[in-house]
Amino acid sequence: MAKATDGSGTPVPQRLLAAATRLFAEQGYDRTSVQEIVEAAGVTKGALYHYFGSKEDLLQEVYARVLRLQQERLDSFADADAPVEQRLRDAAADVVVTTIENLDDASIFFRSMHHLSPEKNKQVRLERRRYHERFRALVEEGQRSGVFSTATPADLIVDYHFGSVHHLSTWYRPDGPLTQQEVADHLADLLLRALRP
């Protein structure tokens, strides 16, 4: 069994995820072998199967770790003691920033999610739905209180915003004309403008 950490103290699961993320981004999920992943991580196949069970589990975890981070942050924004407009704007901008910060993970997942088994695909969709429902609840709270317009259904507003977020990997470039925070601010402001009465 591989050492639990490497010379820098990085635990085996994180090494495997980092190696898989890099290789999936460079070569594609379907063209990356388990052998390449374990060699890049400096571990044995036994270590991979101990921590993840399969290459498919690695793919699922690449996306799930970002979604967990985003869910925790959304919950924090949603529960904050602030006006609903500010909470929604903060959450809308944050999901853009965290997606850009993890662009390889998001890109890999959306390109490769069709490789997941129906069971794993369903699990990921349920986790995403939970996130979207919490986000939608902020929109609905603002609509009920009269802060936001009810002219457009909350579901459509949420789909509009997340359509933009999910396609960041197709056009955003770190060396482009906008910083990640500028993109986040623009998209959050677009969302709020769409909701103004």
What do the PLM-derived regions correspond to, one by one?
Residues 1-3, 93-101, 132-145, 163-164, ...:
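C-terminal peripheral helix-coil segments that are non-catalytic and often amphipathic
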Residues 61, 75-105, 154-161, 184:
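Hydrophobic alpha-helical connector segments
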Residues 68-71, 75, 119-145, 154-159, ...:
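Amphipathic alpha-helical packing segments from all-alpha helical-bundle domains
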Residues 55, 62, 66, 70, ...:
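Hydrophobic/aromatic residues within well-ordered alpha-helical segments
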Residues 100-119, 170:
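Amphipathic alpha-helical segments used for helix-helix packing
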Residues 26-30, 80-81, 102, 145, ...:
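Short coil/turn segments at alpha/beta junctions that flank glycine-rich nucleotide-binding fingerprints
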Residues 1-11, 15-18, 81:
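N-terminal intrinsically disordered/low-complexity leader segments
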Residues 15, 19-57, 61:
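Helix-turn-helix
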